[in-house]
């Protein structure tokens, strides 16, 4: 009888562990981390992170985003907009480079909580940001 109980217990554990979820490599985004980082990141030739953050805010507003949070100390800006009735969220971080001669900006966009991996979206954002920084540096408002 004890052998039957042990066999049933072992079979039960096997069935339960078979229902457990497995870790998917996509959860950590291991597929294309380097590719994603390269399309989401640009370096700008200014050491003033606050100017970059102000221009990030202006650029997002120019692109019809509503600023949800902005923290110049941390160098983060979060914004949302509606596109075809769905929510697009963009989070942008700015940090000084290791040499303190440039500022590195990384943008992360989501469409309905799914990451946007279309390079054109990021190219358009960084192009607008670059123009804004140029105009700001040359005192054109």
Positions of the model-derived regions?
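C-terminal motif of bacterial Sec signal peptides marking the signal peptidase cleavage site
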Residues: 15-18
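Bacterial N-terminal signal peptides that target proteins for export
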Residues: 1-8
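Ser/Thr-rich, low-complexity intrinsically disordered terminal regions
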Residues: 20-141
């Amino acid at each position: 009888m004890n052998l039957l109980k042990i066999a049933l217990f072992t079979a039960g554990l096997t069935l339960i562990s078979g229902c457990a979820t497995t870790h998917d490599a996509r959860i950590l985004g291991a597929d294309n981390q380097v590719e994603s980082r390269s399309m989401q990141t640009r370096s700008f030739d200014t050491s003033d992170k606050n100017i970059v953050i102000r221009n990030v805010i202006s650029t997002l507003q120019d692109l019809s985003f509503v600023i949800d949070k902005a923290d110049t100390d941390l160098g983060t800006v979060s914004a949302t907009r509606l596109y075809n009735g769905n929510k697009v969220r963009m989070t942008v971080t700015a940090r000084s480079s290791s040499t303190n001669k440039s500022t590195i900006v990384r943008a992360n966009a989501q469409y309905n909580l799914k990451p946007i991996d279309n390079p054109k979206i990021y190219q358009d954002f960084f192009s607008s940001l670059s123009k804004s920084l140029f105009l700001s540096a040359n005192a054109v408002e």
